[in-house]
């Protein structure tokens, strides 16, 4: 006869969240982060701190309700792995083509679609997303903003998070110069600022390494069923106000930005501090990361939507010292509009009143080539005032160049200046003096 001496259930019938909270107290933050990453199959020993934070961000839609996340990056960085393999509560929609009935509500059968059945709906290969119904994207926008949607006579609410993952085919530098970081999206989504503004977080997939065998762990982590169950249990809790004890968000964040940042902060607190115990420094680390992830969305909206999204200088204020700290995105350069140190020859920054009446920073970058005295300007468009003030500067240099320096030539050289409006407030017409300084600087080869 067969007798069973001991039976260990592999699948969890229920999860004791208090057990997780008590267990968390035995770990440091770094150790707990490593356990969470190993539970997902990653080997943290092969990753730097930044990469760990980015990989952990992929789990945010699993712990937060109605969280909208986007990750675009190179191939073979494991973008869709978590949503397909780690949680049985998330579904990966491959192939792109879908219908409103499948995703939201089937009016014929009176059944709720994927958003009502799963905790997280992830779309693989965003470039191929296509709705058979014309109103598909409009309903998706409504759902992403409010967590509810109307079909027929009824309004339905759901809590599923939306994830969009896809491949970037060019380098980030090229994308930033030629289009936007949302370029891989289909045109009806990638140029719709109302849709993109609903994304809470943009993970820079190009910073995550391509996975090799050594990136996968052989070490211990939580069994997948246990991880998925306690992550699902954490969706019921809210930690979005965790930052209010120590910090206040800056004035440049509107309501959507604030909601996004609070959701990211709340998600990270659930993942890293499920016991609810954290220090000011730990919450600041999360807050800086959250502001960066949302600012990346806002920077691209500014490129696509112009003046409407000029407020991208995200900051937070320390409630103890009242010091305001600004947060930048790495791919856009440093956190300051005017960098520290000496500029290159021909590079000039000027502060002036823009077209909108707001004070802003403008950058001039110059180039000098052998030629016959031509003066070319880029970045001014058809603005007459700007062109007149730059012509005034060049004419002054032609008339008085020898008095400034004998080595300045306006007949044997061509000059090109590119003008940039760094804050999107409209180009200033007061460019005569900065243009003259830039021309002299490049002509003499001196900063």
Task: Name each region found by the language model.
Residues 39-43, 129, 143-147, 168, ...:
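Conserved, well-folded catalytic cores of nucleic-acid-processing
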Residues 28, 32, 132, 136, ...:
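Helical mechanochemical/support elements of P-loop NTPase systems and associated helical scaffolds
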Residues 43-175, 179-183, 194-197, 315-332:
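Conserved ASCE/P-loop NTPase catalytic core
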Residues 77, 127-129, 162-172, 206-210, ...:
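Conserved nucleotide-binding/hydrolysis micro-motifs of P-loop NTPases
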Residues 155-162, 167-272:
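Phosphate-sensing "switch" segment of ASCE/P-loop ATPases
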Residues 213-215, 241-316, 322, 326-340, ...:
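C-terminal helical "lid" subdomain and adjoining coupling/linker elements of P-loop NTPases
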Residues 303-447:
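Terminal-proximal interaction/regulatory segments of ATP-powered molecular machines
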Residues 2-47:
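Charged, amphipathic alpha-helical linker segments immediately N-terminal to NTP-binding catalytic cores
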């Amino acid at each position: 006869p067969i007798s069973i001496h001991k039976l260990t259930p592999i699948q969890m019938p229920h999860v004791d969240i208090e057990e997780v909270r008590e267990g968390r107290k035995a770990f440091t933050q770094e150790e707990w982060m490593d356990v969470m990453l190993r539970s997902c199959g990653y080997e943290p020993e092969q990753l730097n701190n930044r990469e760990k934070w980015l990989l952990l961000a992929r789990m945010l839609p699993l712990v937060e309700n109605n969280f909208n996340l986007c990750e675009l990056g190179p191939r073979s960085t494991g973008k869709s792995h978590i949503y397909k393999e780690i949680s049985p509560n998330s579904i990966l929609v491959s192939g792109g083509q879908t219908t409103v009935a499948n995703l939201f509500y089937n009016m014929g059968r009176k059944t709720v679609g994927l958003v009502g059945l799963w905790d997280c709906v992830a779309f693989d290969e965003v470039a191929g997303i296509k709705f058979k119904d014309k109103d598909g994207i409009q309903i998706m926008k409504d759902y992403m903003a409010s967590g509810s949607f109307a079909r027929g006579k009824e309004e339905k609410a759901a809590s599923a998070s939306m994830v969009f993952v896809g491949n970037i085919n060019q380098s980030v530098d090229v994308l930033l110069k030629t289009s936007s970081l949302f370029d891989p999206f289909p045109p009806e989504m990638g140029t719709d600022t109302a849709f993109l503004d609903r994304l809470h977080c943009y993970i820079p997939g190009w910073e995550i390494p391509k996975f090799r065998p050594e990136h996968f762990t052989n070490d211990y982590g939580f069994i997948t069923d246990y991880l998925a169950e306690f992550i699902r249990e954490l969706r019921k809790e809210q930690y979005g106000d965790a930052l209010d004890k120590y910090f206040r968000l800056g004035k440049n964040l509107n309501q959507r930005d604030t909601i996004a940042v609070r959701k990211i902060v709340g998600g990270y607190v659930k993942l890293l501090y499920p016991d609810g115990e954290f220090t000011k420094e730990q919450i600041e680390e999360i807050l800086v990361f959250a502001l960066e992830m949302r600012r990346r969305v806002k920077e691209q909206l500014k490129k696509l939507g112009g003046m409407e999204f000029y407020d991208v200088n995200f900051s937070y204020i320390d409630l103890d010292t009242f010091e305001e700290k600004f947060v930048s995105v790495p791919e856009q350069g440093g956190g300051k509009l005017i960098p520290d140190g000496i500029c290159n020859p021909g590079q000039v920054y000027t502060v002036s009143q823009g077209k909108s009446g707001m004070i802003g920073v403008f950058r001039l970058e110059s180039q000098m080539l052998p030629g016959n005295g031509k003066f070319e300007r880029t970045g001014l468009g058809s603005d007459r005032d700007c062109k007149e003030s730059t012509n005034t500067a060049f004419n002054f240099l032609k008339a008085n160049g020898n008095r400034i320096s004998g080595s300045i030539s306006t007949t044997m050289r061509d000059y090109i200046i590119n003008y940039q409006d760094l804050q999107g407030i409209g180009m200033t017409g007061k460019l005569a003096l900065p243009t003259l300084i830039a021309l002299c600087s490049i002509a003499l080869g001196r900063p």
